[in-house]
């Protein structure tokens, strides 16, 4: 509602629960749209994108890491497609910021969205939106019918060093401290490397367990794990109640088939050790099993 309006036509990657939210938002705000409907965990391809070339789209919306499945979409292909078709690229990077390399200039990202609660490891409550030059011009010239999410109003207040309403001050202070911590620990590249190593360590060590990683294009922040012959919600519950370990359940059709393991925040290799040990124990007890 700040960047697009009824005169636009946007294309949305919808491969899970968070892609669907972009669809819902466009429907709510009467923004003409079409969706690239992908199977759960499926990556985007050039062949898929080419079907939508030269069709008058003005914007492209994507959750670059679809958190519900863990798939990390091919940003190079998307960026090239948007550049070729003169489309504004909006990237929800909430689950990929500080976990995968992202560069607004290199990747031709016009609107970059993230939040306080993922790899920044602060409490939820702050949304961070970065606008490129083209997006800034859009915001300045667009009429936004919103009291609390009017970016033009926020930008105008920013020029006087203020916000239009009281922000979550304590979370801003925590973000400031967290950014200093990341800088002191070697910077953004070191943080991405640390998270990548945690993710790869976990993925290698579950290969001898009755678990599968079906997604072929993975980001570093989260791994979607399928239980071969166990119910995922049973495993999630056992880990929580018996081992004091919290992993992420899934809802919907895959709720009993899949759970997710995060690799961001203050997690360490020692946390991986505890989780792997618990999963092996569940296997020994016949709760996590190869056969029915």
Predicted regions mapped to residue ranges:
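Conserved PLP-anchoring active-site segment centered on the Schiff-base-forming lysine
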Residues: 4-18
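Active-site phosphate-binding strand-loop segment of PLP-dependent enzymes
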Residues: 43-98, 111
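Conserved active-site segment immediately N-terminal to the catalytic lysine
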Residues: 105-117
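Active-site C-terminal subdomain of aminotransferase-like
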Residues: 117-201
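Conserved PLP-binding catalytic core of the aspartate aminotransferase-like
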Residues: 211-242
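Conserved PLP cofactor-binding pocket of PLP-dependent enzymes
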Residues: 242-260
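PLP-dependent enzyme catalytic core of the Aspartate aminotransferase-like
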Residues: 257-292
């Amino acid at each position: 509602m700040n960047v697009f309006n009824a005169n636009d036509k946007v294309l949305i990657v919808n491969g899970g629960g968070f892609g669907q939210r972009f669809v819902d938002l466009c429907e709510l705000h009467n923004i003409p749209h079409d969706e690239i409907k992908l199977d759960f965990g499926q990556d985007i391809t050039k062949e898929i994108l080419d079907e939508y070339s030269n069709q008058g789209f003005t914007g492209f919306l994507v959750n670059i890491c679809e958190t519900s499945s863990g798939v990390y979409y091919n940003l190079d292909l998307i960026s090239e497609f948007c550049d070729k078709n003169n489309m504004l690229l909006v990237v929800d990077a909430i689950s990929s910021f500080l976990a995968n390399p992202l560069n607004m200039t290199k990747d031709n990202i016009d609107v970059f969205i993230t939040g306080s609660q993922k790899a920044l490891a602060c409490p939820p409550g702050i949304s961070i939106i970065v606008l490129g030059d083209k997006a800034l011009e859009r915001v300045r010239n667009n009429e936004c019918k919103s009291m609390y999410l009017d970016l033009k109003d926020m930008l105008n207040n920013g020029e006087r060093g203020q916000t239009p309403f009281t922000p979550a001050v304590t979370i801003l202070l925590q973000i400031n401290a967290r950014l200093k911590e990341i800088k002191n620990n070697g910077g953004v590249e070191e943080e991405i490397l640390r998270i990548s190593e945690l993710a790869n360590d976990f993925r290698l060590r579950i290969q001898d367990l009755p678990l599968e990683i079906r997604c072929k294009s993975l980001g570093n922040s989260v791994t979607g794990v399928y239980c071969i012959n166990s119910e995922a919600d049973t495993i999630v519950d056992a880990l929580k109640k018996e081992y004091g370990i919290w992993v992420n359940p899934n809802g919907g059709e895959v709720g009993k088939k899949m759970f997710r393991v995060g690799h961001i925040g203050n997690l360490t290799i020692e946390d991986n050790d505890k989780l792997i040990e618990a999963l092996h124990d569940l296997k020994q007890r016949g709760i996590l099993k190869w056969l029915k």
